[in-house]
């Protein structure tokens, strides 16, 4: 049975054959390539380009069997002299690798079962080496036969089955199918010659045919005459009848990932070919196994590149560049022999040796580019998968670290038959010093004992509660039996496994009794799995709700303490370059940088480490400080006996136990921490399903899923940095525990300054000495400081993995190189993912998932122009979706591959499909049959994602009036500026522009019907009176049919076109969910609830309506509803959503501005006329054209032009993403940042008292409210619709705030009354067309307040 007869998402082979047999197809693809490239305009007066787009979209839906026919029509070609094999930033004269697929891939060996060993004692399968856990190269067809031959259950049979599951799980799709992913990569690919043109010249060839990797792909397909694997609901499958290597799917996705990155300028074509060749070489044994075995040699080669390059060093402070100097690193440079390459001799001689030989003459551009390019040799652009149960020693088992901490005395309490240590007296002087610092610093932290119950509930998330399968199965049966409706019962049962619902259920049971609570603290919980790119798989030790109470209390004192100490860094809070401030400042200054990673910090954390800090936390909650507050356990507000508990206490010192005469009375927060220490290492069960249904993990490892896991590590690292800094400041007189002599620290202690940052197990350290030191002496001083820090961590029992460099440092996966950002494009995986739960959903979801990653390439790539190409191709690839119906017209939910009965969930209206069929200029539908079912493949219009909602950059356009509109830039954001593009392209007006004020005034007056009115009055009137809706007829002035034909109308309906689970489930009415919601609201702070109701009522009297879900009084309800929204879509919901989609498609054919508020509001965008202006732009900083700024801002590039004009961000500016991260996400608040900002703006107009009531209504703290006020006052980000269109990851380097906009605003308009919204609109328009709008430090734009825009140059 062929694939096309089984699967919905393939169009019939006959359809593809017809296209491939068409002699015009090569020209169609070339025409399409020029459209997405921006070098050929789309003609809005013709439907031809829509047809071209549908042809290409159809090809992306071909089956595996048709790929050889496509490759035959478009064979790989050798580059001619005009198509040089290397990109414009490459300098390595590498020949293209000879195509040679290893015989081990074409004829793989049999599976090696002998490396797997069964331990009958633990019922666990293990391997002898940590690298053996990864999937080897073997013949999958043989493995399938071996599994089919298993007749009885046995350990050896389980090993065989587990190995097959390992193969099934080796790839999880991101959003697109393998074939769609391949076509996206091919059509996005630009050869190095065309990359350098940035869309300025029309292409005369299809670039992918000249790719060396495409030649490899063709060679991989040829022996099978198809792509011999596919991915369905069960995972990766091979086609029957073929001998396929287990590494084939990994190599396929690695190939298309590398092809995609060539167009972005991160690899040259020849180097990408060699890179893929190395992965072929490694795949002979196993991709992931050899990746870890061989990465050491690549690290050595990268060290050679960095140590021999001469770079520009950017010395800066808070993003103000103080100096730019040329500098050569003094890092140690390894010899070629020391690199110890283990790849084949062919690769060593023809690839690594030429790279090594040219490293003696590396300038700034070459050095930075090559170091990034070698990252693709270091790690595969794939998620590292494998049975986590085989890697328990790495993350699921405890390890001793460098030593066990010794204590001369302990204080213990007796809890339920067990003595628990709650305080220690360390033997080591240094560990004693850390304990003293912990006691001192935590005692300074203010602890609030009020509303602890409410605070703990508000901290609950909508993640999994970590319950075991057995617990969930019993709970599920109990809930389903209680409900007559199976659908409601299943929904509620699924919700019960979510943390916030689980907590509500337990508050009335186990949280009422100490004994039951303690039993649950030590109950088994579930272990999760994490798969990451370039890193080994990990076990996540989840923690039950009872145990989380103590973790939350510890977090409450640790977090404010280490934030006050000032050594922490918040990671990706803002999302742009300001998150990198520490690494940029450190790497831009002279001296040694130490990037430290604690090896296995979770696994190395002992009970004693937790007690070391936990004892200080118990003291911080001392009754003398906070009394005996109410907190569960049937406690009361009046501080009765239920608010405390007396525990027998003893002291052990020098082996002697000394019982205390008086037992100690502990309050409930102290007891909760003690109980957590009691159950800190309860068992966790890993359900990975590979070689056994479940595996018990270690009971000694520190749980990675505890609330305070990260804060425990951060607190400890901060205290070590504090001890080091204080000891240096005090003269460094008494080194600890046999530390080597630090003579330079002792000599220069008075002038040494430390930069230290810590978060979790990541640490950055750099020291600065007096200016009198020579560079060599400064290196020695900083080396001593870093060595002393590592020594202190070892005294605590942790082993450090460090990287020393005088020009480079890394922290939180962010790297600074000579004071400039050094990004990691190799860590963006576009086509595969960790979970695969968003694969092949609907066009909007698929587009958004992939588009977010492609935009991220703007901040990590040299040639950001190609992100435009990639996003436009993505628009085409995601423009189709299929409906599968039975002969009776009922939708079918599951595919044939699931081997489960079909779920027929709704009946489709034949009338709607007929209506769509009749509008062939708007939609295309291909009908075919699969296993007796009817398939309708629906194609959306060409530019369906080019709108202010999805934000795809518009291509070049010839408008209906004949104006030429250039293609938009990679810095296009989903804003009204895109609507401006559509209105310009479909406007029936023709206006002749003239630079003279008289002609301009006449044009304005004629349009607005305000003749003989002075120009300045027109400006003032239009700004004040919203002239747009009064003076235009949208139906008459714009070609609505063109808006519909090319996809604008469908696009702006995308949110309702493909409903999200939250939109669907918001309509569900369930009495049980309502009861849960009321109970959740009752768990909130009653005082704040009353204030919330009062504030909402007062604001309502001023016509300010606080949305229900944003009110603090209903925050519990919001959590319950959110837990319902995040569950997977059910079959019934799928049917309802699909019917909504069809209905909305039908509605889009009837929409007009006069009948649709959505369309009318979208079309009332601002108007921008492009005319020359003589106002010079004041540059905020020196030109970056000469030096560039790191890897992704080459000299004389679009990025350097914009950075010169816009400048680097201001470190103190407040961004939307920062608010969303620190306030909404970390604070576990419902709603979006946009909703809070819009509400604040509306309230602000009513006066300060209204803002005070808003604070009460939404339940914000003083700090949260200040953050919201800063966000709103930041002008540009204070405008809803602009704030959230801007993506900091897309404009990573550029300053984009109100002050900067105002600086340009004075140049953009002759009107003194220009509105803030107008400035925002101009900024977004400028970012869409930067090369058009900025010319020799002058702008080419002026604003007038009407409803359409002219962006075309005369």
UniProtKB/Swiss-Prot annotation:
RNA-directed RNA polymerase that is involved in transcription and genome replication. Following infection, it catalyzes the synthesis of fully conservative plus strands. After core assembly, which consists in recruitment of one capped plus-strand for each genomic segments and polymerase complexes, the polymerase switches mode and catalyzes the synthesis of complementary minus-strands. Keywords: Hydrolase, Nucleotidyltransferase, RNA-directed RNA polymerase, Transferase, Viral RNA replication. Its EC number is 2.7.7.48. It comes from the Viruses. It catalyses: RNA(n) + a ribonucleoside 5'-triphosphate = RNA(n+1) + diphosphate. Pfam families: CPV_RdRP_N, CPV_RdRP_pol_dom. GO terms for molecular function: hydrolase activity; RNA-directed RNA polymerase activity. Gene3D superfamilies: RNA-directed RNA polymerase lambda-3. This is RNA-directed RNA polymerase VP1.
């Amino acid at each position: 049975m062929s694939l096309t007869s089984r699967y919905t998402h393939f169009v019939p082979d006959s359809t593809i054959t017809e296209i491939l047999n068409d002699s015009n197809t090569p020209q169609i693809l070339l025409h399409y390539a020029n459209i997405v490239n921006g070098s050929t305009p789309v003609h809005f007066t013709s439907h031809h380009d829509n047809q071209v787009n549908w042809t290409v979209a159809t090809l992306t839906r071909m089956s595996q069997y048709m790929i050889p026919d496509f490759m035959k029509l478009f064979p790989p070609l050798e580059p001619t002299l005009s198509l040089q094999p290397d990109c414009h930033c490459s300098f390595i004269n590498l020949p293209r690798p000879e195509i040679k697929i290893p015989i081990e891939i074409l004829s793989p060996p049999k599976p090696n079962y002998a490396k797997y060993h069964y331990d009958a004692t633990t019922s666990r399968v293990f391997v002898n080496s940590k690298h053996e856990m990864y999937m080897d190269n073997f013949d999958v067809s043989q493995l399938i036969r071996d599994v089919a031959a298993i007749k009885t259950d046995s350990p050896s049979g389980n090993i065989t089955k587990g190995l097959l599951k390992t193969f099934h799980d080796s790839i999880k799709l991101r959003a697109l199918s393998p074939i769609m992913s391949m076509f996206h990569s091919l059509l996005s690919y630009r050869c190095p010659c065309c990359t350098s043109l940035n869309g300025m010249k029309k292409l005369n060839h299809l670039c992918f045919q000249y790719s060396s990797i495409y030649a490899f792909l063709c060679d991989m397909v040829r022996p099978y005459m198809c792509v011999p694997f596919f991915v369905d609901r069960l995972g990766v499958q091979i086609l029957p009848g073929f001998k396929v290597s287990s590494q084939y799917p990994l190599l396929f996705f690695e190939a298309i990932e590398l092809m995609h990155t060539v167009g972005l300028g991160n690899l040259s074509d020849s180097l990408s070919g060699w890179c893929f060749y190395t992965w072929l070489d490694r795949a002979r044994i196993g991709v992931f196994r050899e990746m870890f075995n061989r990465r050491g040699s690549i690290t050595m080669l990268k060290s050679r590149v960095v140590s021999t390059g001469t770079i520009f060093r950017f010395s800066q402070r808070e993003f103000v560049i103080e100096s730019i100097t040329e500098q050569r690193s003094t890092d140690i440079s390894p010899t070629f022999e020391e690199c110890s390459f283990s790849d084949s001799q062919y690769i060593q001689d023809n690839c690594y040796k030429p790279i090594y030989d040219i490293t003696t003459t590396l300038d700034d551009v070459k050095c930075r580019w090559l170091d990034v390019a070698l990252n693709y040799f270091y790690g595969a652009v794939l998620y590292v998968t494998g049975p986590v149960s085989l890697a328990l020693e790495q993350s699921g088992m405890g390890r001793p670290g460098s030593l066990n901490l010794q204590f001369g005395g302990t204080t213990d309490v007796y809890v339920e038959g067990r003595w628990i240590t709650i305080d220690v007296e360390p033997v080591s002087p240094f560990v004693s010093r850390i304990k003293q610092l912990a006691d001192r610093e935590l005692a300074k932290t203010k602890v609030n004992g009020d509303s602890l119950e409410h605070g703990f509930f508000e901290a609950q998330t909508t993640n999994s509660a970590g319950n075991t399968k057995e617990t969930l199965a019993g709970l599920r049966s109990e809930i389903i039996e209680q409900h007559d409706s199976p659908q409601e019962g299943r929904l509620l049962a699924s919700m019960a496994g979510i943390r916030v619902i689980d907590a509500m259920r337990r508050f009335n049971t186990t949280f009422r009794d100490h004994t039951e609570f303690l039993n649950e603290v030590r109950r088994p919980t579930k272990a999760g799995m994490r798969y990451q790119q370039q890193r080994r798989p990990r076990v996540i030790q989840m923690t039950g709700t009872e145990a989380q109470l103590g973790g939350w209390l510890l977090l409450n004192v640790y977090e404010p303490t280490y934030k006050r100490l000032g050594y922490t860094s918040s990671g990706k809070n803002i999302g742009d370059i300001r998150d990198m401030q520490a690494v940029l400042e450190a790497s831009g200054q002279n001296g040694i940088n130490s990037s430290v990673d604690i090896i296995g910090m979770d696994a190395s954390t002992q009970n004693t480490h937790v007690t070391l800090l936990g004892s200080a936390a118990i003291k911080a909650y001392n009754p003398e400080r906070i009394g005996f507050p109410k907190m569960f356990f049937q406690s009361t507000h009046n501080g009765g006996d239920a608010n405390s508990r007396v525990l027998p206490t003893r002291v052990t010192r020098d082996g002697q136990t000394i019982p205390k005469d008086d037992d100690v009375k502990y309050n409930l927060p102290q007891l909760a921490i003690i109980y957590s220490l009691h159950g800190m290492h309860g068992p966790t069960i890993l359900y990975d399903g590979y070689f056994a249904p479940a595996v018990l993990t270690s009971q000694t490892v520190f749980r990675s899923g505890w609330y305070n896991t990260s804060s425990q590590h951060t607190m400890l690292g901060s205290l070590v940095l504090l001890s080091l800094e204080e000891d240096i400041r005090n003269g460094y007189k008494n080194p600890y525990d046999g530390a080597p002599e630090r003579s330079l620290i002792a000599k220069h202690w008075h002038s040494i300054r430390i930069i230290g940052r810590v978060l979790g197990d990541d640490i950055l350290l750099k020291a600065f000495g007096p200016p009198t030191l020579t560079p060599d002496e400064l290196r020695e001083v900083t080396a001593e400081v870093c060595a002393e820090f590592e020594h202190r961590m070892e005294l605590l029992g942790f082993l450090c993995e460090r990287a020393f460099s005088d020009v480079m440092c890394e922290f939180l996966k962010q790297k600074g190189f000579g004071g400039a950002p050094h990004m990691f494009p190799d860590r963006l995986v576009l086509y595969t993912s960790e979970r695969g739960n968003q694969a092949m959903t609907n066009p909007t979801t698929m587009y958004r998932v992939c588009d977010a990653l492609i935009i991220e390439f703007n901040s990590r790539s040299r040639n950001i122009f190609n992100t435009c190409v990639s996003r436009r191709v993505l628009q085409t690839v995601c423009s189709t979706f299929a409906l599968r119906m039975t002969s009776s017209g009922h939708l079918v939910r599951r595919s044939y591959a699931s081997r489960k009965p079909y779920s027929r969930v709704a009946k489709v209206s034949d009338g709607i499909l007929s209506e769509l069929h009749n509008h062939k200029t708007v939609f295309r539908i291909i009908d075919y049959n699969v296993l007796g079912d009817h398939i309708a493949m629906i194609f959306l219009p060409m530019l369906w994602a080019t709108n202010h909602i999805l934000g795809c950059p518009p291509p070049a356009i010839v408008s209906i009036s004949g104006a030429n509109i250039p293609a938009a830039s990679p810095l296009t954001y989903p804003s009204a500026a895109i609507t401006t593009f559509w209105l310009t392209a479909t406007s029936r007006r023709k206006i002749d522009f003239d630079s003279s004020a008289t002609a301009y005034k006449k044009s304005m007056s004629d349009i607005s019907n305000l003749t003989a009115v002075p120009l300045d009055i027109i400006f003032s009137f239009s700004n004040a009176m919203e002239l747009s809706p009064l003076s235009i007829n949208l139906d008459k002035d714009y070609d609505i049919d063109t808006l519909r034909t090319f996809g604008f109308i469908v696009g702006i309906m995308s949110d309702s076109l493909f409903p999200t689970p939250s939109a669907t489930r918001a309509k569900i009415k369930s009495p049980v969910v309502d009861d849960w919601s009321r109970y959740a609201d009752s768990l909130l702070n009653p005082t704040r609830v009353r204030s919330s109701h009062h504030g909402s009522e007062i604001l309502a009297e001023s016509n300010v309506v606080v949305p229900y879900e944003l009110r603090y009084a209903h925050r519990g309800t919001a959590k319950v509803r959110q837990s319902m929204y995040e569950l997977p879509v059910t079959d019934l919901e799928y049917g309802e959503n699909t019917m909504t989609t069809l209905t909305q498609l039908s509605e889009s054919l009837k929409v007009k501005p006069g009948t649709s508020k959505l369309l009318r509001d979208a079309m009332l965008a601002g108007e921008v006329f492009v005319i020359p202006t003589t106002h010079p732009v004041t540059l905020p900083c020196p030109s970056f054209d000469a030096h560039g700024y790191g890897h992704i801002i080459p000299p004389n590039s679009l990025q350097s032009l914009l950075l010169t004009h816009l400048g680097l961000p201001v470190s103190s500016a407040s961004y939307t993403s920062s608010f969303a991260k620190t306030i909404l996400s970390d604070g576990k608040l419902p709603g979006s940042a946009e909703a809070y900002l819009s509400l604040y703006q509306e309230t602000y107009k009513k006066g300060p008292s209204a803002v005070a009531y808003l604070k009460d209504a939404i339940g914000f703290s003083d700090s949260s409210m200040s953050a919201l006020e800063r966000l709103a006052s930041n002008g540009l980000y204070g405008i809803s619709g602009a704030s959230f269109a801007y993506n900091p990851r897309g404009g990573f380097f550029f300053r984009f705030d109100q002050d900067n906009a105002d600086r340009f605003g004075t140049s953009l308009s002759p009107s003194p009354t220009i509105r803030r919204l107008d400035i925002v609109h101009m900024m977004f328009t400028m970012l869409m067309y930067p090369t058009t709008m900025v010319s020799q430090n002058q702008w080419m734009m002026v604003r007038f307040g009407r409803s359409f825009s002219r962006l075309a140059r005369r």
